Amino acid sequence: MNIFFDFDGTLIDSHRRLYELFQFLIPESTLSFNEYWDLKRNQIDHKTILKKYFGINNSQPFEKEWMKKIETKKYLDLDKPHEGVTEYLIYLKNKNLSLYLITDRQLPRGVYYQLKKFGWINFFDAILITAQKYSKEDLIKPLISTNKADYIVGDTGKDILTGKNLKIKSIAVSNGFLSKEILEKYRPDAIYNKVTDFHPE
């Protein structure tokens, strides 16, 4: 059995990283951490937030700076593993499952830096990074033979749709970047509060 895990929001808690960078780039922002994430978890993007709350009609300079800074070590060091994930990955490996990391990160160095930092580097059979150039499906298809017994686990609608396109089971977790109500619209095979609640059969 193959299990494909998304990284940000699914295995690691990146909420603080995104919020702190937003506050840095928009210093006039008085949005609290919870206010910012209430918006984001309801699928309200930065372009809409900038226009509605700050009167910024051209979001391109913001987006450019965001992409430049979001994967720097300064901000990556704000990330932390979701509770119990290390033990969970050990549990899955002991079941002789094939685990893959599939992420939309731009830069491999930040991914490997965090995997080494968290002690996860040897848990995965392969680490697939789209570099914001390819879809997750594009990376998985030519490299790994999948079947209907396999899973993809993520916290976004895109992850669920990837599973459907690959004809594998899609598992959503609701403690990441989208709310349970938003995730339900994509009709995953199951939704869990956190990744460690998922136990593949």
Question: What is each residue range found by the language model?
Answer:
Residues M1, Y112-E201:
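Asp-based, Mg2+/Mn2+-dependent phosphohydrolase catalytic module
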Residues N2-E87:
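N-terminal helical cap/lid subdomain that shapes the substrate entry/recognition surface
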